[in-house]
Amino acid sequence: MNNSVDFGGRPFHFIGIGGIGMSALAYVLAKRQLPVSGSDLRPNHITRKLESIGTHIFSRQEASNLEFFGSKVSSTEIELNTQEMFPVGKSTLPQVVCSTAINSNNLEYQAAIELGCPILHRSDVLAALINDYHSVAVAGTHGKTTTSSMIGYMLLEAGLDPTIIVGGEVNAWEGNARLGQSSYLVAEADESDGSLVKHAPEIGIITNIELDHPDHYDTLEEVVDIFQTFAKGCKTLIGSVDCETVRELLRNASGDRQQPTITYSLHQDTEADYTVTNIDYRADGTTALVWEKGKALGVLKLKLLSRHNLSNALAAVAVGRLVGLEFGEIAKGIAGFEGARRRFEFRGEVDGITFIDDYAHHPSEIRATLAAARLQARPGQRVVAIFQPHRYSRTLTFLEEFSESFSHADLVVLTDIYSAGEPNLGLISGENLAEKIAQEHPQVVYQPTLSTVCEYLLKNLRPGDLALFLGAGNLNQAIPEIITTLCAPATATL
């Protein structure tokens, strides 16, 4: 692929523009008044939002889509903004952007090669944007979306007006991206396909490192290599020493680095730069006293409940201090942050049943999310975990770990595996996982489809239950159906 990105006015065409990562980039480029088009076979609210700001989106993927901007220029009905976009002699063949999910037999991808269009990976565009700004890039196996969103919100509330690109939707800016007018950029940096190595931000954060994405990585060592390369490219590196792998990476990198390294921890008995004491988990959130290099800064309050979100907040504190914010400004921003969608997101309450949607799909994420649910649950309240496994490769690789991840749930309801495009080789199924979990947890029910999940929950959820829908697939589509059905004889709080 061609790694050179042209922000000078040459069009961009995104293959699969409706994806969460692709759409965020397309949004920022379109808001920068660059010509953007894209295609997606499954139009959604994200593509409709892009269309509302002038992005042309095709619902079919065809070679002719790449000639859209050329036809606009040659048309006798040229709009004024099109003339401005394409001065005389400017190439109208687009830069074609794709993600790892797009394979080489895609019609638009093949057409791009034949036409000689520059072909960019999604990460190339993000890397170029990171280089264009005073940038903060958040990396890590878990917590990227929440941490980057929290930092973005904190800087926004402090008046720094950042550009923000994250892997989830945030109500504060009604989407997964916003274009700011300042020189600051906050971005989520994805490690899933190895492209993390392309990013060289001014401030880089590593929240934690675990083996995940077994479709791309065979060993933890391979994952660590990617993060080590990322770390070397950061002018300032921030890392959580509560993760043993991050701690080891920082230790090994310290001798090679001329740049500052900043650490944070939930344990004051470490030598971390930022720590906390007096942690208090309440139904309405979390409070803690924050320390900076042994000096008390003040009390931090979060609307989010859990240890992992407090850790994410410490990363935000470190960033805030680096960019010159007073602790009061930092605390105000973090206190107002309500989280990202599908990250322990409240979806409704009816008949005393609370519905929560969470993206957790790795064993560690499930454990942390259910632990947070148990903290929030009232005495006697059941925690019901409804889980849709994501990818055959992940389910097979972490079969043992998944079986040990549901100890905080009173009842586990399991669906079949959401393939995310992977072929079913017959090596693992949702039913196999249910049987494995049942060895550790006596209350496990297997319901293979969304319709059978809905039927089961409508019959078996009780008033007072805390129902958590877990997974990165489409399980959350069942929530509105269940709430609507329950609402027939009752009144829901949405």
UniProtKB/Swiss-Prot annotation:
It is an enzyme of class 6 (ligase). Pathway: Cell wall biogenesis; peptidoglycan biosynthesis. Keywords: ATP-binding, Cell cycle, Cell division, Cell shape, Cell wall biogenesis/degradation, Cytoplasm, Ligase, Nucleotide-binding, Peptidoglycan synthesis. This is UDP-N-acetylmuramate--L-alanine ligase. Belongs to the MurCDEF family. GO terms for cellular component: cytoplasm. The keyword Cell cycle applies. Gene3D superfamilies: Mur ligase, C-terminal domain (3.90.190.20), Mur-like, catalytic domain (3.40.1190.10), NAD(P)-binding Rossmann-like Domain (3.40.50.720). It comes from the Bacteria. GO terms for molecular function: ATP binding; UDP-N-acetylmuramate-L-alanine ligase activity. It catalyses: UDP-N-acetyl-alpha-D-muramate + L-alanine + ATP = UDP-N-acetyl-alpha-D-muramoyl-L-alanine + ADP + phosphate + H(+).
